[in-house]
Amino acid sequence: MTLYAAGSLRLAFTPLLAAFEQESGHQVEATFGPAGTLRERIEQGERPQVFASANLEHPQRLVALDFAQAVQPFTRNRLCATVRNIPELTQPDLLTLLCDPQWRVGTSTPLADPSGDYAQQLFDHLERLLPGQGSALRSRAVALVGGPDSAPIPAGRLAAEYLLAESQADIFLGYASYADTLAACAQVKVRRLPTVLDFKVTYGLCLLDEGYVAAQALVAFILGVRGQRILQRMGMLALE
């Protein structure tokens, strides 16, 4: 069975798929990457049995194109800011830092990667809160990962840690599900977004082969008690 899944699910799906394979006997060949890029590959003819996206929009498009019948929300996440571990970036108010043009802000690539789309939503929130500041941040933020032309992140490295270590940004806006793993990286610090900018995002999956029993079993496992516990243990958030 083949699974296409958002790259932000790799940490959580690695133990989840191992548990599923042990319990069910079904083997899963997983491909991880930017959800928008994976959705385009499906539209162009590739056919995994299951698609798990970091948003609802990409699987909804596949439903609209009759590649799938329904979208199932299965977990949630939120954004955070990872900063270089220096007092100038760890001590001041994060909202102040985001509005300070001296700091370079990195994101993932909008459209190709939902994380980049969520960063754009954050800029929208900031613009409503402080008119002019959201548009200014949007204009100077740089998409550093997740796009077709983005430089690859070395194996075993997290994008936020690598990009900050390579001095490509001072602040990186990405998923909070990486926070525990990033906490082990001394050169960076994870900071939660201020309440006025914080929001949760919903991940959705769809079956692309409704008649494939193993795929049905995988979806049931992800949505079931054991799958949900693994997702939450690995930093994802429960559906509310």
Go through each PLM region and give its residues.
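Central helical "cap/lid" subdomain
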Residues: D66-Q72
